[in-house]
Amino acid sequence: MGLSSYLLDKFLNHHFKGTAAGTAPATLYGSIHSANPALTGANEVTATYFSGRASYTASNFSAPATLGNYRQIVSTASLNFGTSIAAGSNLPYFGFWDAATGGNFLGGFAFTDSLGSEILLNFGNGDTVSRASGSIKIGLDINAWSIYARDLQLNWLKGTGMGSAPSTNDVALATALTADGTITEITATVATGGRFSIPSANWSAITTVGNTRQIQTTNDINFGAAIAAATGFNAIGLFSSTNLIVFASVSTQNIVVGQELIIPASKFKVSLGNV
């Protein structure tokens, strides 16, 4: 469960391919699903049990906060489906859309109890069905994506736009790099031109890989020959101006003078999704 392919593509296009995410929805619409909605909103059964999707004000989520390896927002109001028109049993998932009917699927999630354990939704015909404030939690991992980027994405779901899309991203080499953007950078030490700039046009089309959406660079990332030695190189970061977007660990290695610092296009990939 997690974000839809529509939303994953929107975020990848914004961060890397120069197409802004655009206006964020002020209202989300909750749906019920009989099985995994996957990336597209499959298995929706809302109309079987209710007169329509549940309207929810997007701003009624908490500010993003770190919980373990995730940035998370939590509902601050109830999600009300209204009075059921048929009894429902063992319904496992709900989703959010940007319209009361049709529209774009934004993401699907399991129903959970107050402890975060997955549960099944059951109700009788004529019951009033709702999910209490605090029961809806949306978390995005910060294992490879920065806190800055995840907060942009979560706040978009809360109704706050992401602003203008960057026209370039810059690749940095480091001996230490964390999700909050703290970096021990060696790029300027080993590379004549410093960080390597990737124009938004130099990314591939977005493709599906497993439960993720993925892009890769269409040109090599070539820093040239190292102008100085460096020890303990173990991380690569991709920045938008001064803000870290994504990062990755690499096998620790020492850079020697004259070493060609090249990442082939086929090896530099960015994935966003539900792993």
Which stretches of residues belong to each language-model region?
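Small cysteine-rich, disulfide-bonded extracellular modules of the LU/uPAR three-finger superfamily
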Residues: 1-92, 98-234, 240-275
